Amino acid sequence: MTLIPRDLIPPGVKAAYGLALDESDAEIVHMSSLINRTYLVQGDLGQGRQAMVLQRLHPVFGANVHLDIEAVTLHLERKELETPRLLRNKSGELWTCFDSGADPAGHERALAASAAPPEVWRASSYVDGLTIHRSEDPSQLASAAELLGRFHGALFDLEHEFVHVRPLHDTARHLEKLRLALGSEQGRADREAQELGSAILEQARGLRLDYSEFPRRVLHGDPKLSNLLFFRAQPARARCMIDLDTLGRGFLAYELGDALRSWGNRTGEDSVTANFDVEVLAAVLSGYARACPPALPAAEICSAVAGLETVSLELASRFAADAIIDSYFGWDATRFPSRRAHNLVRARGQFSLAQSVHRQAAALGQIAQQAVASRPAR
């Protein structure tokens, strides 16, 4: 985290939240975030508040996502799960729209009135915690899974129609996008991408894409480890879920599969080879089964194994398509000569992970069943 000058926060945003930063000893710290521009404001902020998080929302998210976040976090709070809460601006609204011609207080209504969408800012309460990007500690992963299980369980009875609807996982669409990319003039000329993309599509022929026997549940949408906070004094204990812009309804297989993909790949996304660690599956599903509602069917939890292969192959297809189309993913110019090169490495890594899961499918399925069967009676 890096201290930044106070004038980097637009005056209209400071006014909207009653922040007299130029007249106080408050510090503004730039926090690591891949999507939204995020700042931690610390000091005497009035009304007994010592810290808040200010964020400028990435345009990929609509401002109405805050209606969903408010509904979910209010429900979590009522269920006594710790969660960051949105802080309303001086006009009583959940977000603030700001541009050079905006009302200094900012208003939700300004979003609809402006021809060019203004910047969207929000404030939220600050939950102190440790951010972890990778872990090899089974107890830490089990605790993370327990938190995810409590999170899902608390939202089982949430009656809310999501306003900001984005498909959490649309594997068929991503595979079709790869087919089209391979068939394009640029794709046909790229032998390396052709070979990799064709292999991905071949394995995808055996994927399970239909989970409609299970209900669509309220999911986080991006359960990577860095979207969980851990207690600083007890790093093995998960504290709360953060980064809630991806909330929505979907199948548990995808959510748990994505968590396993992220948590169980020891080499990370920038390696061409990957092997799924079976110990991660046992720790994660055992922890999840301990904390989720007893009524959650074992078959639905065990669908995580199929979801793991599906999500890994889906991401491989997205990276491979972008290596040809070059339209979505960012890349590391300090480590790779081009966006295409970086995306090919990432595609190979996710495909390698999907192959590893496919090879171990029978063993993984057995481990999943054993983990779920061991959950205590409640």
Task: Mark where each language-model region is.
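Small/polar glycine-rich anion-binding or flexible loop at a beta-alpha turn
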Residues: 301-311
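Catalytic activation segment of kinase domains across protein kinase-like and atypical kinase folds
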Residues: 226-265
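Short secondary-structure junctions
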Residues: 15-24, 78-82, 211, 294-295
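Juxta-kinase regulatory segment immediately upstream of eukaryotic protein kinase catalytic domains
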Residues: 1-27
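Active-site activation/catalytic loop segments of kinase-like enzymes and analogous catalytic loops
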Residues: 253-294, 310-331
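Conserved ATP-binding subdomain of kinase catalytic cores across diverse folds
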Residues: 29, 34-39, 44, 49-51, ...
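ATP/Mg2+ or Mg2+-diphosphate-binding catalytic cores
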Residues: 182, 314-378
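ATP-dependent phospho-/nucleotidyl transfer catalytic cores
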Residues: 29-32, 55-64, 104-113, 130-142, ...
